[in-house]
């Protein structure tokens, strides 16, 4: 799996003790996954690459900051989604919280994970609004996460809210994000299937 080069600096620079589950979720997300395998058997699934890496920014002892981008595999220089993920204990310490933020000046961060960790600098001013939170709990072999019951607000492609369920497991991640309009009708996203992101092989 294509994780070592992206993750190594992260492991070497972590000096503060973290909630083991917070660390576990972050470790699982870091690396490169794609939907290539699923797309080969289902032509309706786009070939998408998801790249996630640690950033040089730790304002809170019990949180880990990650940069994540998603792009069509043949257009990696044009990601359609760029986020900062803050992985931390939830307010009541019952789950792990993954809180996603948009970025100011997002084009400046394209292919951010190709840089060395010491060059992946993030400032508070780089963070725009928070867009969604997923709450994760450990399951056999990984973690399961969901958005709040009411979903997260959005204005993407005719939807006013999104919901998502993710499963982190030994082969990668399964995700089923869905967008709903003001009448509660699904307007985009997973139907009966889930999006299957799998670790890239070296």
Swiss-Prot record:
Q: Name one GO molecular function term.
A: lyase activity
Which keywords does this Swiss-Prot/TrEMBL entry list? Lyase
- Which enzyme type, at the first EC level? lyase
What Pfam families has UniProt attached to this entry? Answer: CpeT
Q: Sorted alphabetically, which InterPro entries does this protein's record hold?
A: CpcT/CpeT, CpcT/CpeT_sf
Q: What is its EC number?
A: 4.-.-.-
Looking up Gene3D superfamilies in the UniProt record yields:
CpcT/CpeT domain
What family is reported? Belongs to the CpcT/CpeT biliprotein lyase family.
* Xref: PANTHER family: CHROMOPHORE LYASE CRL, CHLOROPLASTIC
Q: What does this protein do?
A: Covalently attaches a chromophore to Cys residue(s) of phycobiliproteins.
The name this protein carries in UniProt is: Chromophore lyase CpcT/CpeT 3
Organism of this sequence = Microcystis aeruginosa (strain NIES-843 / IAM M-2473)
């Amino acid at each position: 799996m294509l994780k070592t080069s992206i993750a190594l600096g992260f492991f070497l620079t972590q000096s503060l003790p973290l909630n083991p589950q917070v660390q576990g979720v972050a470790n699982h997300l870091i690396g490169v996954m794609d939907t290539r395998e699923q797309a080969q058997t289902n032509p309706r699934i786009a070939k998408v690459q998801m790249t996630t890496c640690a950033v040089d920014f730790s304002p809170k002892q019990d949180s880990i900051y990650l940069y994540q981008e998603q792009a069509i595999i043949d257009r990696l220089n044009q990601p359609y989604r760029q986020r900062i993920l803050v992985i931390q204990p939830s307010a009541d310490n019952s789950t792990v919280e993954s809180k996603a933020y948009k970025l100011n000046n997002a084009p400046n961060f394209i292919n951010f994970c190709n840089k060395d960790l010491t060059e992946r600098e993030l400032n508070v001013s780089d963070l725009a609004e928070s867009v969604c939170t997923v709450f994760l709990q450990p399951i056999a072999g990984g973690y399961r996460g969901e958005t709040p019951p009411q979903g997260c607000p959005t204005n993407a492609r005719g939807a006013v809210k999104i919901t998502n369920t993710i499963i982190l497991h030994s082969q990668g991640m399964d995700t089923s994000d869905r967008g709903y309009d003001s009448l509660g009708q699904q307007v985009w996203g997973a139907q009966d299937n889930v999006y299957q992101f799998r670790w890239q092989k070296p």
